[in-house]
């Protein structure tokens, strides 16, 4: 006997979260809970404003229609990426095919005063990998901050993300301030320039490895080995079903590329599932999931060690 529930939710964000020049005051999304006999599976559907093509309202309509079809015996997945991902997670939990083991290690997202960051990063146990957003300020400033961190902590490796913010000139201005002796400790720089060709040229000219992120979701993207390209960053909420995520990870690994499972600012429930997906598909790579602290609460499932208050399922709005 099948049953289902869909929950709508909204989490207040910390002040100062800006996506594509838009301040994000709340994170809005949906959960689907599927039940069959004694078994239960959950999934999160939370399109990311400015990045997802679909809106939260679009996703809700598609999800509710899919749930009705599933209750009637139809299991075909929807095409909309955020819905396909959430639904496939719920089905995988229901079928017990999403392993419970999780990788809760995070590459901490660094912002704020560089002196404070140095103290925090120097105390990190184990492999020191951190993420820095660049492209929000002047490229010269970004270069100086990155150089300072790499200089101060000799065993630190940085993942940088420019979100296609730079022209070729700005990319060169950034690189000019990063000591060539430290550049190999930049694990990769995600999408430095506005076009893929300019990003490839940046990698060739600077020796700084790059990673594809937004490019993976463009219709003309193909997985090929290229000089200077070291990694792909896979955001399942923007990608689609678990099968599609797994296909992309396998395609990257076949080329010797690092595949990084990354957050689209999901709630704690979605983040814990991403941690399980990372442990399953990319066990040797620290995922990019350090976004929970941007929110003011957790929901339904806790992220281990987080002090944020937990909102129970009973407090969420039911849609069925």
Curated annotation (Swiss-Prot):
PANTHER family hit by this protein: O-SUCCINYLBENZOATE SYNTHASE (PTHR48073:SF2), O-SUCCINYLBENZOATE SYNTHASE-RELATED (PTHR48073)
InterPro entries noted in UniProt: Enolase-like_C_sf, Enolase-like_N, Enolase_C-like, Mandelate_racemase_C, OSB_synthase_MenC1, OSBS_N
Name of the protein described by the UniProt record: o-succinylbenzoate synthase
Family: Belongs to the mandelate racemase/muconate lactonizing enzyme family. MenC type 1 subfamily.
Reactions performed catalytically: (1R,6R)-6-hydroxy-2-succinyl-cyclohexa-2,4-diene-1-carboxylate = 2-succinylbenzoate + H2O
A molecular-function term among this protein's GO annotations: magnesium ion binding
Record pathway: Quinol/quinone metabolism; 1,4-dihydroxy-2-naphthoate biosynthesis; 1,4-dihydroxy-2-naphthoate from chorismate: step 4/7; Quinol/quinone metabolism; menaquinone biosynthesis
Its EC number(s): 4.2.1.113
Keyword presence, Ubl conjugation: no
Assigned keywords, A-Z: Lyase, Magnesium, Menaquinone biosynthesis, Metal-binding
Phylogenetic classification of the source organism: Bacteria, Pseudomonadati, Pseudomonadota, Gammaproteobacteria, Enterobacterales
Residues at the active site: 133, 235
BP term (GO), one: menaquinone biosynthetic process
Cofactor(s) annotated in UniProt: a divalent metal cation
Top-level lineage group: Bacteria
Task performed by this protein: Converts 2-succinyl-6-hydroxy-2,4-cyclohexadiene-1-carboxylate (SHCHC) to 2-succinylbenzoate (OSB).
Gene3D superfamilies: Enolase-like C-terminal domain, Enolase-like, N-terminal domain
Residues engaged in binding Mg(2+): 161, 190, 213
KW Protease (keyword) present: no
